[in-house]
Amino acid sequence: MNNSYRPLLPVNPKGLDDVADALLKNDSNIPPQDDSLSSGFTNIQSPEKYIFLPGKSHGSFSYSDMFVPMDRTHQGKNWSDAHLALYQEGAFMLTIRQFVDFLNLLRHDIVHDGNGRVVNKSKVGAILDDILTVRDPYRAEWLDADFKVKDKKLKVVGGKLYMNYEHTIVKGVVTSKRSEEMQGYLAGDKTPGIDLDDWLKNALPSGLPSANFKDGKLYYYEPDWDNNSVAGFGAYSGGAGLGCGGNLSGTSGGLGVRACREKNGGTR
C-alpha cells in the first residue's frame, strides 16, 4: 500500500493468448429464443445490442436483472465524468462483481440479447476477445468502485479500507449508495499474476480476488489507500488485468464504459 500512482492496466508483456483461445472455443447447445427477456425492456433503443445479465445475490451484494451493452462507449472520459454521462442517460456502470458475472455468463452460459434472441457464438467470442485478448489497440473500461480509508488514527496510521459502489449523481456530485469494508481480499499487486478461472469462480462478493488466490497470467493491482483509487479492467499488447489502484482523473482514448440499464427500466 502506497500513495504512488499506479497504472490502471499492466505494463509488462505477459500474455493471456492461450486463455483467450480457450474462451473462444467454448461450445454450447443453442436453445430457442426467450421472449420473456424483452418484457418491460422499453426504455432504450436497439435492444439487440445489449446482453441480458440475470440478477444475482452474493452475500450482502445483490442486483436485479439488467442489460449490458455489447460495446463500450464514452471513450476518453475520466471515471467521474463517465458516471455523470451515464446518469444523464439513465444508465449506470458495472460494479466489479457484475463484471465478473458478465464474464462468467459470456464464457459458460447461453447468452441472450435484449430481445431474448440467442447471441451466436462468434459474436460472444468477439466480445470476449475484445475484453481479454492481449493485443493492441488498448481497450479498457471503468468499473463502479472507488476505495476509501476510514478510521485512521490521527489521520496517519491504521484504518480500514472500504469499497464504495452503486454510484449516482446527487447535486452534481458522484455519490455512492453502498459502502462495504474490504475483508479477505488479495492485498498486494500481482504483475503477473492471478489465475483468470480462479478469480471468476471464487471472487469475493465485492468481485475482488480472494487472498487465497492461484497464480496465473492476469495482472492485478490492489486498491490503493490514497482515497483516490478507482477500478477498471483492460488489455493491450503488454497484458490484461484488473486494476483497483487507478486514478479517478485518468483518461485515455481507449478507456470507456458500458452504459448498463435495469431490465425493469429503473434508474439509480
Residue map of PLM features:
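A short glycine-rich, aromatic-capped structural motif
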Residues: 2, 11-13, 17-105
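C-terminal, surface-exposed recognition/capping segments
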Residues: 112-268
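Charged, often glycine-rich, active-site loop that binds/positions anionic groups
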Residues: 100-118
